[in-house]
């Protein structure tokens, strides 16, 4: 039994979302359009967790569909968004997705570290 418990604990630790891995994925996959602190092709992400979709300060490039979606960026909605933005909000403008659930969890863990808006 102890070996099974150790194996389960190791698997759980390996599967736990990792903000450092998420930051690396974010830098590789997201920074062509996004930044934590500056709007670009896409909106800045600092403070995204818990924010209403389509409301990042100073960003004017949102689709009408996203602005009207009523979504609040929580773990479940971010996961669905990153997996397939068009299915979640038809008519939105984001052109990429992350198919791997582990990568999505890591990116979401990283986004949570950007909780406070930079003033």
Model-predicted segments: where are they?
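Electrostatic cytochrome c docking/interface patches
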Residues: 2-25, 118
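Sequence/structural segment immediately N-terminal to covalent heme-attachment motifs in c-type
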Residues: 16-40, 45
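Short glycine/threonine-rich turn/loop motifs
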Residues: 19, 43-64
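Soluble non-cytosolic domains of exported or imported proteins
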Residues: 20, 24, 39, 68, ...
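A generic structural signal for secondary-structure junctions
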Residues: 38, 49-53, 83-86
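Short Fe-S-cluster ligation motifs
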Residues: 58-79
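C-terminal capping alpha-helices of c-type cytochrome domains
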Residues: 74-119
């Amino acid at each position: 039994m102890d070996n099974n418990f150790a194996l389960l604990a190791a698997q759980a630790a390996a599967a736990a979302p990792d903000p450092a891995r998420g930051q690396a994925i974010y830098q590789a996959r997201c920074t062509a359009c996004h930044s934590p602190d500056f709007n670009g092709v896409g909106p800045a992400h600092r403070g995204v967790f818990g924010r209403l979709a389509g409301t990042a300060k100073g960003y004017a490039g949102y689709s009408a569909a996203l602005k009207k979606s009523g979504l609040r960026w929580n773990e479940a909605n971010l996961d669905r968004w990153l997996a397939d933005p068009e299915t979640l909000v038809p008519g939105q403008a984001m052109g990429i997705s992350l198919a791997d659930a582990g990568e999505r969890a890591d990116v979401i863990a990283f986004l949570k570290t950007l909780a406070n808006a930079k003033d």
